[in-house]
Design a protein with these regions (language model features):
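Mid-to-C-terminal alpha-helical segments outside catalytic/metal-binding sites
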Residues: 264-299
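Bacterial N-terminal signal peptides
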Residues: 4-16
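Histidine/acidic residue-rich metal-binding segments in metalloenzymes
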Residues: 42-50, 67-72, 78, 98-113, ...
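An N-terminally biased module of ancient metal coordination in phosphate/nucleic-acid-related enzymes
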Residues: 17-80
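Short acidic/histidine-rich active-site segments
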Residues: 216, 246-263
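Glycine-rich phosphate-binding "P-loop"
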Residues: 27-36, 119-142
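Hydrophobic faces of well-ordered beta-strands that scaffold small-molecule active sites
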Residues: 23-29, 57-59, 83-86, 112-116, ...
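Active-site environment of divalent metal-dependent phosphoester hydrolases
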Residues: 32-34, 64-68, 89-92, 121-124, ...
Length: 299
């Protein structure tokens, strides 16, 4: 498979990775400790990022906030900026303003992002992964009051919004409500694959409303038995990026699963695919350095 050969190239040409990945920010990093299997620890991911001169990693966990982990690993591994987030799944109380408040107040101030529900989202339950204990964000075309409360807490702490596994319609509602509260740093979480499955016209609309759209390497890997509907070919991914416009895009890995490439290898392979498709160095810089930095509130 092409992605395996790219990972192999990364081992054959170690000098190429620092040059390609210097200053890159990955906004979707899975790692251990976690309640599910991971191929790499957060400490290992940070050390590899330092080796390749990356700027920052955003640590993601579907079931607990990662601001504490980001702070602890930062104490152990200098030379890399690490940030944490919270995903509003059932394990943190679902749409829970108090959980967001505590994440924002965690030592170090490294909690930067709130994901709306992911694996526990109502949209995921109805379209991809049945889960009767789902977490709703909207009813009858309107965001729930507790979602608006979360957005208010986010605005007061200067946090960034990721739409999680919300439906396309819910994502647009979230963007509109967030912008109304002065939350300008918004990412539509991997809009292409299930369970989000946002069509290209809606992706363009989200961009026009002021959101960035995330395209991830993980989805381009060969479909597996656990998540076959998440597969989106690299060709289709590149077409969507071009249609939406690199100025409206962030590129991430969403890696850390056993059997998949590690984060740096996936990003390196994504860069090679972008270059092969005619994307310029300036466009790649925008998608992998400038826009991710803006989303995290970095200068």
């Amino acid at each position: 498979m092409w992605f395996r050969s790219f990972a192999f190239v990364c081992f054959l040409m170690p000098a190429a990775l620092p040059a390609q990945l210097e200053g890159v920010i990955d906004l979707h990093v899975h790692s251990a400790p976690d309640s599910g299997p991971r191929s790499i620890t957060a400490v290992e991911a940070a050390r590899i990022a330092v080796r390749y001169k990356m700027r920052a990693l955003l640590l993601k966990n579907h079931y607990t906030h990662t601001a504490s982990l980001a702070y602890t690993v930062s104490e152990v591994v200098p030379g890399i900026e690490l940030y944490g987030a919270i995903a509003l799944n059932r394990s943190v109380g679902g749409i829970n303003p108090t959980a967001v408040e505590h994440m924002a107040r965690t030592t170090g101030g490294l909690g930067r992002v709130v994901w709306m529900p992911t694996f526990d989202s109502e949209h995921s339950h109805r379209t991809a992964n049945p889960n009767p204990l789902f977490v709703s964000v909207a009813k009858d075309g309107k965001l729930l009051p507790e979602v608006l409360q979360v957005l208010d807490v986010m605005a007061s702490h200067g946090l960034s919004l990721a739409t999680g596994h919300s439906s396309p319609a819910e994502s647009l509602l979230l963007i509109e409500a967030a912008k109304a509260r002065g939350i300008d740093r918004i990412v539509v979480t991997h809009p292409q694959p299930d369970p989000v499955a946002m069509d290209i016209e809606t992706q363009k609309k989200a961009a026009a409303m002021g959101a960035l759209l995330e395209y991830k390497f993980n989805s381009t890997l060969a479909p597996n038995s656990a998540w076959p509907s998440e597969f989106v070919s690299m060709s289709d991914t590149l077409k969507s990026i071009r249609a939406v416009g690199p100025e409206n895009v962030v590129v991430s890995s969403d890696l850390g699963q056993p059997g998949n490439p590690i984060h740096a290898d996936g990003l390196f392979a994504f860069i090679q695919a972008l270059k092969s498709a005619g994307f310029t160095e300036s466009e790649i810089n925008t998608m992998m350095r400038i826009n991710p930095a803006k989303f995290l509130g970095l200068k």
